Amino acid sequence: MNKIIFVLVISFFSILSLQAQSKELGVASEIRNILESSSLGELSHDSKVNFSQYDLLIKFYSKREFKEAWTKEGGLSSQALVLRDQVRESLYDGLVPEDYYLGQLDDIIMNFEIEKMGENALQLAYVDLIFSESYLKLATDLYKGKTPQEAIKTNWQIQAKTVKVKFEEVLESAVKGDSIGQSIRGFWPEYKVYANIRESLRDYYKMASSQEENTPELEYKKLIKLGDRNRLIVEIRSRLIGEGSEVDSELYDSALLKEVLKVQKRFGLNPDGVIGPATISALNETPEDMILRIAVNLERLRWLPDTVVEDKFIMVNIANYQLDYVQDNGLDTLFSSKVIVGKQYRSTPVFNGEMSYIVFSPTWTVPLSIVRGEMIPKIKRDPSYLSRNHMKILTYSGKEVDPAGLEWSTVSVKNFPYMVRQSPGPHNSLGLVKFIFPNKFNVYIHDTPSKSLFDKDIRAFSHGCIRLHKPAEFAEVILQDNALWDKEKIYEAMHSGKETAVMLKKKIPVVILYLTFWTDTGGKNYIRKDIYNRDEEIARALFQ
């Protein structure tokens, strides 16, 4: 055997003594010996393959009596080539093909083509184990995510996916059925948006490979409106329309306006056609930037539990400032509304729960953190603050306390043993209705009296809860299966001034997501600002 070929595939110098025995043993015996001895550790060192799926390898091979899966009569099976191609394709899952030993697989395949490798059972055993390790590692990362979500410091609290798949059994079935490619794709998340995003990533890799180097970054200096002349328009036109058009290249005309509007809509900006700092920032996004962004969001989808995919569920995308009530795997939208989410320092957490009831004309018991951090200083400055905001001070047993009887000069954030509660009504910070899905964060969806904030592009203003733009319409949709609660009765309850709770006949799954990129069924891409700066940490974990 040519030593150069050994270097390309596996260094066998540490196991020369075992090779002499391999002629007398079958491949199955060699696989068993390797798995039951220290030889796998030697192989890890020599081949630079980290056999992280050892437990699954044992299960897989023991059930098939340690028979080889990827070679036949001394040659590689066609499914080995399919696996190599699937590993290469993992690039478009936002993964790194080298993590699944693409280089080693390529070398093995090349060496089988150059020279007969089937004369050595030990060598065939090692080849088989490397292919199985590659498959199982890729399968588990596609199914659960490459990075354990608990290792990410950002506030991701969605219930981890329950592993129901027996990877070794899927591999066995795929080997028998010559369906390796189909089985790998079967590990993708159930959400149809995943495949859509994946194709977008493929497109951005093509853009990155064809992009001219050193593309200048656009520098914002002043607002540019339709009809304005500006040197920056030359570069913007080149990027969005292309060169060679016989027009006044510095004039912001209607043809360019159409393209600018597309960019603004794609990035979730106000589509007013005015080229300002946010639009310039969007235009400066490179294909490389988008590749990282897409990879991060594909990983987020892999983290989601399958239980999120229900007949109907409520989805809030924090980064998109939008709530959607959907069915049919998210393809059919029953209701949509703008939302306001938490400020950066009081960010809305990512989690899932079940909506179980609605409260009309709610009171608001102010969280202690807000009382201490914001209200006490305001009350000290303005004795009328509480009455003007329809608030009362209560003991924890529910007894009302006269604020005039408190010695406010001695009250501090550390010694305020009371609750502050706001009465129902249009003045209430929760508005006229709240939607409850019990959770440890005390986060819920609610109305708000501050309607003007929904006109903003960036809507991160709350203390963590989710404010809804169209609460009455949402209540109607949620209660449409309850004949006792029609539009008129809902309106009456919202304006009654009396707190009224209504239990839902069936709990509705709620998932609070954070996606900064997605692709719809028509292939349109949507990009959103990373308002909580959460993408970078996941990107580092994926590509470190």
Residue ranges and their predicted role:
Residues 1-5, 20:
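Positively charged n-region of N-terminal signal peptides that target proteins for export
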Residues 7-15:
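Bacterial N-terminal signal peptides
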Residues 21-64, 129, 136-137, 156, ...:
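Well-ordered beta-sheet/strand-loop patches within structured domains
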